[in-house]
Amino acid sequence: MNAPVKPSKLIKGATGDWEIVIGLEVHAQVSSKSKLFSGASTEFGGDPNAHVSLVDAAMPGMLPVINEECVKQAVRSGLGLNAQINLRSTFDRKNYFYPDLPQGYQISQFKSPIVGEGEVQVDVADGDGVTVGIERLHLEQDAGKLLHDQNPTMSLVDLNRSGVALMEIVSKPDIRSADQAKAYVTKLRTILRYLGTCDGDMEKGSLRADVNVSVRKPGAPLGTRCEIKNVNSIRFIGQAIDYEARRQIGILEDGGSIDQETRLFDAGKGETRSMRSKEEAHDYRYFPDPDLLPLQFDQAFVDALKAELPELPDAKKARFIADFGLSADDAGVLVSERESAEFYETVLSKLADAGRDGKLAANWVINELFGRLNKEGVAIEASPVSTAQLAAIVDLIGEATISGKIAKELFEIVWQEGGDPRATVEARGMRQVTDTGAIEKVVDDIVNANPDKVAQAQAKPALIGWFVGQVMKSSGGKANPQTVNDLLKSKLGL
């Protein structure tokens, strides 16, 4: 049971506060080479109707045959969501007519899904975390795609996507803000990507969401919900929720009532608009698919898949915090994408002393590397600075061979030119000066040349930073910062 909604999450209306209630149905394309009930390819981007079997086209007499890998992927996903795996599930026909659905029905799971209740722990930037309950996860076929811009007088149908396996992941109505909804979908996407069960590519339609939104006065019964169909980006999910909540509040405060309906989100205008009245389950006339036997497996099948699961984001985050003293925020950034976590762990594996420098390595991965990658628009897989090179830079800092300032210069050289960081340090004379006598001479020169600053620093010790900066500048950034600090404190009597 989630805690009451914080006042800051309520929406102010003309008649007082309103609470948003949100549930999401996320459609995640299963990562598999072939479709749910046929051997046709799931490859993205082929010519129209290039990946269509007789089953996908619903030719008479063609029977569906279940793809075992899709079943395994659904079970893996359920385990990753801490959900109940149902050892017996069934397939049903969801009946409706649309040109991109050649069978005249969609094979789905209505009465007995493969995965039951679970939960996802969601962190939000402002600390407004939430546990989102999972109602169910079921397997179903995707539909084809209508193309309206290929011919001026007709719409064309591409069935490449028809029959591709989807996991529909249905949340409970536990979400109370657009930020929570975005964080939930982000976390769900991350989990599926870690598991390798969905690539999460929203631009290609691999992950899309139907967003159910209603509003109510705090503590009142649930309001009438509207469903916003096929929202295909996390940013749009937030925008759609904010607009729809305001729209419903406006209607209710004007004395109107909310019609239960299906709406779409117009990204260009940032608003939702009506598509059709919202269907109920009976509108689809669900009944068991007579061509498919119940899907049954034993607990040993589930246990074998569970034993092969990778470490998931929450467990990895906890380990990074415990083993390397990372902050929750830094650990969260590192585990937010599987590739970034793998990069960091590979850097750790190449460090001379990961226990000593694990936190330093995290700082460099997050602040220097990620910052530069984002600025340049480069994916981490294509990083000009390799894990071995970054580990070498961190080692050089950790063993006091170079200072932090010099390390940033070295990082820039490696980014632009490549090469072995250690060899670069030696070739370019970048080693930090640790000779106390040499540093002391520089300190004495600067202290003697600035008697007014000495008096100010003695009155206000924080001004020692000015002297540190001058010494580092004079030494070309090569002086050992700790030695500089110690000498200055002694010279200034601090």
Swiss-Prot record:
Keyword Nucleotide-binding carried by entry: yes
Alphabetized UniProt keyword annotations: ATP-binding, Ligase, Nucleotide-binding, Protein biosynthesis
PROSITE patterns noted in UniProt: GATB
Recorded catalytic activity of this chain's protein: L-glutamyl-tRNA(Gln) + L-glutamine + ATP + H2O = L-glutaminyl-tRNA(Gln) + L-glutamate + ADP + phosphate + H(+); L-aspartyl-tRNA(Asn) + L-glutamine + ATP + H2O = L-asparaginyl-tRNA(Asn) + L-glutamate + ADP + phosphate + 2 H(+)
Keyword ATP-binding assigned: yes
A Gene Ontology biological process term: glutaminyl-tRNAGln biosynthesis via transamidation
E.C. code: 6.3.5.-
InterPro entries: Asn/Gln-tRNA_amidoTrfase_suB/E, Asn/Gln-tRNA_Trfase_suB/E_cat, Asn/Gln_amidotransferase, Asn/Gln_tRNA_amidoTrase-B-like, GatB, GatB_C_1, GatB_Yqey_C_2, Gln-tRNA_amidoTrfase_suB_CS
Broad EC category: ligase
A Pfam family hit: GatB_Yqey
GO MF, any single term: glutaminyl-tRNA synthase (glutamine-hydrolyzing) activity
Entry-linked HAMAP family: GatB
Self-association state and partner proteins as the record states: Heterotrimer of A, B and C subunits.
Entry similarity comment: Belongs to the GatB/GatE family. GatB subfamily.
Function of the protein: Allows the formation of correctly charged Asn-tRNA(Asn) or Gln-tRNA(Gln) through the transamidation of misacylated Asp-tRNA(Asn) or Glu-tRNA(Gln) in organisms which lack either or both of asparaginyl-tRNA or glutaminyl-tRNA synthetases. The reaction takes place in the presence of glutamine and ATP through an activated phospho-Asp-tRNA(Asn) or phospho-Glu-tRNA(Gln).
Name of the featured protein: Aspartyl/glutamyl-tRNA(Asn/Gln) amidotransferase subunit B
Species whose genome carries this gene: Rhodopseudomonas palustris (strain BisB18)
